[in-house]
C-alpha cells in the first residue's frame, strides 16, 4: 500500500505565507519537496513532481489521494491518541500556482510518528532535551548559524528548551521561528528556509 501511496504523492506544495528566519512575512511558492512546521505546531508535508501530460486530471488525482488517505487512516487509527482526530488530513490537491505544470498534494500529519510511518523516513520534532532523551546525539553535530561554536557543554544546556527538527531526506524546511543551529549538511537559503538537499542523511535544525 505504501508504494501506491507514494505514487499518488506526485507532489506536494502550495504558495504559502511563510515567516522563515526574519520577522517579515513573505509570499514564497514552494518549488521542491518541503516540510513545514506551522506557528501552531502543525506538521505539513509537501512534495513536488511534474504533472504535465495532457491526459492527467488533477480532479482524478485528488479523488485517488483522498481514497488512499482514508484507507490509511482506517488502518492506522491506533497512531492517534485524541478522539475525533485522524492520522493524516489531505490539505489540498491542486496544480502548482506558479504555472510550472506540477501537481500539488499537501498532507497534514497528526505527529512525527505518523509522518515516519507513512513516509518511511525518520523525523523527530520536539525540544532539544527531548531529542537527547530519545537517543539522538545532538552534541557536536550542530554549529551556530553563520559560523560559531559547536553545540556542546554549557551551550547545549542553554538550548535544551528550544525546538529541534531532525529529519531524513532531500527537502526544504520551513519553520515558524528563527533558526539558531544547523548540522553541516543543512544550510539557510536566501528566503530564510533550510536547504536540506545536500544528502539523504539526518539533518538537525534548532530554532526558537
Where are the model-predicted features located?
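Bacterial signal peptide processing site
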Residues: 22-24
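Generic hydrophobic, helix-prone segments enriched in Leu/Val/Ile
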Residues: 1, 15, 62-67, 179-181, ...
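C-terminal motif of bacterial Sec signal peptides marking the signal peptidase cleavage site
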Residues: 17-20
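Gram-negative bacterial Sec-dependent N-terminal signal peptides
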Residues: 10-13
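Mature, soluble, non-transmembrane domains
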Residues: 87-208
Amino acid at each position: 500500500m505504501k508504494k501506491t501511496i507514494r505514487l499518488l504523492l506526485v507532489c506536494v506544495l502550495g504558495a504559502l505565507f511563510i515567516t522563515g528566519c526574519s520577522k517579515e512575512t513573505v509570499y514564497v511558492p514552494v518549488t521542491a519537496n518541503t516540510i513545514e512546521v506551522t506557528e501552531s505546531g502543525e506538521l505539513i508535508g509537501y512534495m513536488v513532481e511534474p504533472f504535465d501530460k495532457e491526459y492527467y486530471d488533477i480532479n482524478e488525482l485528488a479523488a485517488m489521494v483522498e481514497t488512499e488517505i482514508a484507507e490509511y487512516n482506517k488502518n492506522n487509527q491506533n497512531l492517534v491518541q485524541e478522539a475525533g482526530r485522524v492520522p493524516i488530513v489531505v490539505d489540498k490537491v491542486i496544480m502548482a500556482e506558479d504555472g510550472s505544470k506540477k501537481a500539488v498534494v499537501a498532507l497534514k500529519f497528526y505527529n512525527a510518528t505518523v509522518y515516519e510511518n507513512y513516509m518511511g523516513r525518520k523525523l523527530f520534532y520536539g525540544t532539544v532535551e527531548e531529542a537527547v532523551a530519545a537517543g539522538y546525539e545532538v552534541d557536536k553535530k550542530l554549529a551556530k548559524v553563520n559560523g560559531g561554536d559547536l553545540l556542546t557543554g554549557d551551550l547545549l544546556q542553554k538550548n535544551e528548551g528550544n525546538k529541534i527538527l531532525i529529519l531524513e531526506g532531500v527537502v526544504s524546511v520551513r519553520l515558524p521561528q528563527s533558526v539558531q543551529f544547523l548540522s553541516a549538511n543543512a544550510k539557510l537559503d536566501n528566503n530564510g528556509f533550510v536547504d536540506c538537499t545536500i544528502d539523504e542523511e539526518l539533518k538537525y535544525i534548532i530554532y526558537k
